[in-house]
Amino acid sequence: MVVGQLVDELILHANRDNTIRHYYDIALVGYSGDEVYSLLGDEIAFHPITMLAEQEVPRIAYTLSHKTINGDTHNILNEVSMWAKPAAQGATPMYKMICSVTNLVEEWCSRSENRDSFPPLVFNITDGEASDAGYDMLRSAAHRLQSIGTTDGKTLFVNIHISSDTNHTPIIFPNLNEVPLAIHHAHLLMDMSSIMPESLHPYIVECRSWFASPPYIAMSYNASMSELVAMLNIGSRSLTIGQ
């Protein structure tokens, strides 16, 4: 559902005068078992947002809870496209996925037409720990991904952990002092994630429930759906900044 929300938001922001403009190239990559695969039914590759907008995708309804500053809760019925189904069973080849995405991003950034573009944003949405590599290998692979970029900056690697565990305080774009280091997976995600650029700090402050000083880490842990929606909107905010 999170993937669907992201794609829907990008299609919405690419709509100008009832026409979908080619503002984004998107790749949807899944990973489970021993496989890393395209969620668009072909080889792993970038596709223009215009192509995704033309596809017919099943939609499901869900309820989004929103708290006001007065403490009141409002439930909003929403719909989202189902571009991907969760694959919580079996292994989680996260290292293999990062390596595949790194090759994809490297090829995209090397094209002359992309050289001066806003750098790629990579969202890793996970509900578990990697099964194919340890801490050092994952961190090294993530840093290699972040080293690739355009003349406008380096690739932003955003890690989103989704969990039903309610024992820990949810965090979104935390600073270094807010990451629960006692939770191994959160510590790993912190070390794998990019530091958010200063140009996006005003939006990050809007997303967070309380103020904290930068630098902000490109990750979330146990965030609510409304927080995830705000976090994923960083992609459309990046478009505005890049124009």
Residue ranges with predicted function:
Residues 1-243:
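Acidic, low-complexity intrinsically disordered regions
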